[in-house]
Amino acid sequence: MEDRGRETQMPVARYGGPFIMVRLFGQDGEANIQEQRLYELLSDPRSALGLDPGPLIAENLLLVALRGTNNDPRPQRQERARELALVGILLGNGEQGEHLGTESALEASGNNYVYAYGPDWMARPSTWSAEIQQFLRLLGATYVLRVEMGRQFGFEVHRSRPSFRQFQAINHLVLFDNALRKYDSGQVAAGFQRALLVAGPETADTRPDLRKLNEWVFGGRAAGGRQLADELKIVSALRDTYSGHLVLQPTETLDTWKVLSRDTRTAHSLEHGFIHAAGTIQANCPQLFMRRQHPGLFPFVSAIASSLGWYYQTATGPGADARAAARRQQAFQTRAAAECHAKSGVPVVAGFYRTINATLKGGEGLQPTMFNGELGAIKHQALDTVRYDYGHYLIMLGPFQPWSGLTAPPCPYAESSWAQAAVQTALELFSALYPAPCISGYARPPGPSAVIEHLGSLVPKGGLLLFLSHLPDDVKDGLGEMGPARATGPGMQQFVSSYFLNPACSNVFITVRQRGEKINGRTVLQALGRACDMAGCQHYVLGSTVPLGGLNFVNDLASPVSTAEMMDDFSPFFTVEFPPIQEEGARSPVPLDVDESMDISPSYELPWLSLESCLTSILSHPTVGSKEHLVRHTDRVSGGRVAQQPGVGPLDLPLADYAFVAHSQVWTRPGGAPPLPYRTWDRMTEKLLVSAKPGGENVKVSGTVITLGEQGYKVSLDLREGTRLAMAEALLNAAFAPILDPEDVLLTLHLHLDPRRADNSVVMEAMTAASDYARGLGVKLTFGSASCPETGSSASSFMTVVASVSAPGEFSGPLITPVLQKTGSLLIAVRCGDGKIQGGSLFEQLFSDVATTPRAPEALSLKNLFRAVQQLVKSGIVLSGHDISDGGLVTCLVEMALAGQRGVTITMPVASDYLPEMFAEHPGLVFEVEERSVGEVLQTLRSMNMYPAVLGRVGEQGPDQMFEVQHGPETVLRQSLRLLLGTWSSFASEQYECLRPDRINRSMHVSDYGYNEALAVSPLTGKNLSPRRLVTEPDPRCQVAVLCAPGTRGHESLLAAFTNAGCLCRRVFFREVRDNTFLDKYVGLAIGGVHGARDSALAGRATVALINRSPALRDAILKFLNRPDTFSVALGELGVQVLAGLGAVGSTDNPPAPGVEVNVQRSPLILAPNASGMFESRWLNISIPATTSSVMLRGLRGCVLPCWVQGSCLGLQFTNLGMPYVLQNAHQIACHFHSNGTDAWRFAMNYPRNPTEQGNIAGLCSRDGRHLALLCDPSLCTDFWQWEHIPPAFGHPTGCSPWTLMFQAAHLWSLRHGRPSE
């Protein structure tokens, strides 16, 4: 490549045609973390690698490959230049400034050293590249072959040029040990790879160990046909629906939003359905593996919540560099998974993180292993399928993107959330458009698998007839480019096997019947095609099922066969047999030896061990320490159903024991009373809605409780006892949850075992023991998945079992969390153990040389404890509570003190040996009660043969309060909460060192988060802070369209917020709008949701460009925006960009008139990336100016309220630097990021209260106030049960929050100012 933006013609290599390569440069302003680390190393005069460099200069480097040559005719060159400009526009270039240009800030001359690097052009495009290419394809671009974003940095060298040792450092720190590539001048002259293809192995890896384990557990030849999972499951047939080991829990309150409804009176209904919890454990697991594995169990399941957990080897090594490298790898792998889930529109509500030292049993050879659980909702009619038969169509959903280094840091090839979101939306729409049984095959292999294994799982008999012209475009193009010598049967078979059948991919495969009655005028294939078209989901009709075995390919490249002709008789051009099941000879498993010679390691008796030193080591251990670097950087609340996510208390600390996911967020009247007539709104005003006294309604929220339990190290020590301890942890995590009936608790076990170390009898014994234990606990049990370490990792003895609890729940008051509530209350502990150090405990791992056998408590004692505490919770006696798990009793108490930010004084009896008492991990609970209730609680527990202990007292609130432990007259520990919080957060701080820029990590404001207590609620003071819940029929005079862009999810909160405000709400997909009158019947337009693309700013600009590309859609929206009787609201990153790009907000001008093209370059603002460089999920203060013109915020003027703020680009940059002042004077600023003070001028200026540190504006409105765009999302917190923490100013409300007023105000405004649309 040549420098400085000059076009360089490249000869043909991998790409089979002429092309030119263009370099564009964009000043980034600061070096990234890796470049800064390298520069510090090279500039350190004490380092052997020191170069005495000049100032570091860094910039982005965009490489664009374009079809053609400079000798092409002028029209072609003009079109190529237009597409190149389009790439720049999508990446932020505007009329008033360019973020990318041809001039570089670096000069590769003299003593300047310049280093350019990025994704490998000789490998498949990165995920970011694939997604921008998808946008360009939708926008009609044909000349852009590939786009990659790299980096370039440089500095002046005063000494010698970099040597081999310096290049080694660059390779390790910047290139991640060759995961990225150095770009040399002319490097791509050798060609580049355009296609999203990865060559698979010569033969598909059938994972015989994985297949064998699944046959043992779920039935098959290796198990002699027995299905242990079915034999050992414990369910109640009266309460559950199940097929095999899959257990479905029924519900009557699933939100259903109709698609293309012809009923003008309703668009929402509550339907019967089922809830299903699924999960799997996989080594080096694809980030979104469970998202497509779940449809392999139930094809029309909709994910509503997920959970993540990780197992890593402790970051150790011969030196600090090795440990830092291990920490960096872990940080990037977990970040990639967290951000993939953050972009998927499904909230992550539970998780864990465990490290095991390589010197311990189970730690040697441990590969990064991830647990991914998912809670899905299924409509009752969506369970029906048809019998598999010949003559059914084979369908592949989603773009074909074979895996390549998914988990290799810095993860440029991580999975595309956009692709998975589109697939899930397409399946949901397909179910609605064709509500009749039609799917005959949907099974998937149990682990990450090649395409040929997926196809084999679909076919219980016979084989498949596939057509080459219907294969994915990249595969088909590769076949078309084969020369005559290779375009033979064997040659094509080799190519198809290498690039289609043998690679692993992220697609969903199903078979559907050919015939069937038309529904709504559509056949099955037509309905599926329409659903994929609306969802923006690529799909391929690959062929059909046939009696002939194997995969039979028809060469129809010259004359493509239509889908209607696929059922005709064809002669295969070549046939590929399904891979044979590899049978292994019998071999003795490695014995699971455990040293049971000791009950307690003597190491804890050493005089140098003190409570304070032990506590410091345990609180800073990754297994116990804060996981805020994960929880606060993934989606926690999208969709609006989450009532309890991991963060609790005024500091939003990730300490919740359980999650609660509501089945519906749409209001109903108490007692099942019918809704009021919609004409009730005619008598309403904002004043009446705010000042109306609460009606004493006991609002109940029903949903599902989710918890996790895992004891990976203890399972490695003793499979049976470790499994029981995981079950105990999952159950006790649910002890304080609002469970309707303890008998409805469902425990699902996910096994991760190695058949080479545990044979069939060992697995059967462990499963039988688990079944017996569940029966003793009085809960239901099923087995969800079985997996094993990767083939080749024979050195690893790691095994684990993850237990998940799901149970129907219901609450009407505040949820019980670890947040201490009241000064002077008492703490009571109840444990199921003898007070000795538990075998396999974290204390033993850190301070003992001997691994002792763990012991699980008796099932009866655990059952009594769980049910007794559930009874106390229902009686209202318990104020807060937490389970005793990793780190023992003292860790539990510290976490409760930190969650509530209250001092605690603990008193241990003189006669006790307090050290083992403090760190014993025997399952138990600690809970807070008022002093007047202690006698009743103790009597209740003792009557059930439990022995509670009153541990101490809760103190005052504040970060400088003390946590004290007294052993008789001696104070053995006294530390401030501020110091304990720093220790507990130290692991997260280490991870942040690899993830956030140094200037953020070292900022004095980085810990200024939470305490959103001081609220300026003057407009609501003296009035009911919970607005009235007015439940009416949908008002046909106020119809609101929720615009759903392709690739987006999470619109349910917007739909529910407007429905609860009495509006008639419908989803509108881009492809539905076919003329400019489509929106004429609507008075409201809402834009929101989460886009699956990795680059949020790119997704927003591309969405505006897609709207502009469709004249009908563009003119319908512009016509709507210009009508004086309409309002619009845009929430979140995507919504703000779309409304600003359409000209509705961000300037004092009106939107363009219908028929006028929208110029994306003229957008008055662009989104600024977060200062952390990470996705943020924060509970932040938002202030609404008293003078804002917004009609929706009229009732909240002057308020400071907390709100959910989520995204990667949460700041506004105006192309006109003076525009903020113009908008302020025109009263068009809708809200600001605010500090924790009440003064109107105390805006937040620093991260994290201001995520980008780019100004403080968080929302804008139009000049007349009708159009509103907010970076925060009030639809996620319209009810108080959706709030992360309720400030004391609100007391203990259970109704709707002040944010409800903005949606009710929109309804009232439309009735007063709008044109009735009835």
UniProtKB/Swiss-Prot annotation:
Localization in the cell? Virion tegument; Host nucleus
**What's one GO BP annotation on this UniProt entry?**
purine nucleotide biosynthetic process
Q: Name one Pfam family in it.
A: GATase_5
Q: Name one GO cellular component term.
A: host cell nucleus
Q: What is its main location?
A: virion
Q: Which UniProt keywords apply?
A: Host nucleus, Host-virus interaction, Late protein, Virion, Virion tegument
Q: Summarize the subunit comment.
A: Interacts with host DAXX; this interaction disrupts the chromatin remodeling complex ATRX:DAXX and thus allows viral transcription. Interacts with host SMC6; this interaction targets SMC5-SMC6 complex for proteasomal degradation.
Q: What protein name does the entry list?
A: Major tegument protein
Organism of origin? Epstein-Barr virus (strain AG876)
What lineage, starting at the top, does this entry show? Viruses, Duplodnaviria, Heunggongvirae, Peploviricota, Herviviricetes
